[in-house]
Amino acid sequence: MTSFSEIPKSISEVSKQSIDIPKFAKYVNPNDIKDFNEADKKLNVEKIKCINEELEGKKHPITGVKYKRCIVEDGDGNLKEGVFPQFKSEFDAKLPPDEYKSTDSVQFNRANKQLKEAIAENSNLASKFTPQQLEMIESGRTPRGYTWHHSEKLGILQLVDTKIHDQTRHTGGKKFWGGGTENR
């Protein structure tokens, strides 16, 4: 339970604690915005059609994965608004910008390398995997039972449960920042 002493005393304290503020937020003046549609116009946000967007704010009926509306940046600095699944990730890998539009193979190799390095430094992370999975990670492979998901967040690959990923139809980050299907 949170005590009152743990609650920030002012908005400025909250903003100091928040580290997940999107780049586009600097273009928004709250005094100029009266509703979300007006904000979208000022930001030049393109609304895009997403698979299962009708599940916004709901959970997938089979997997229980929640869908959330987000504004994301593509690899070219454009803003897109869509509805995306919020998978439980065991590990997030961050690609360098020059690999955003690389093939899946290049991206997954980079992610596997980051996972291997993170496990070497963090025994709590290692404890999430079986000995066989750790062996696969050590040899540079994606651990059995997991898939690298292209998050809607620019350059982020999430290590998620393969079965849940495969059963949760969605539009992923590969479409926006990863070069689309031609870069598979």
Predicted regions and their residues:
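Nuclease and nuclease-like effector domains acting on nucleic acids or nucleotide cofactors
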Residues: T2-T147, E152-R184
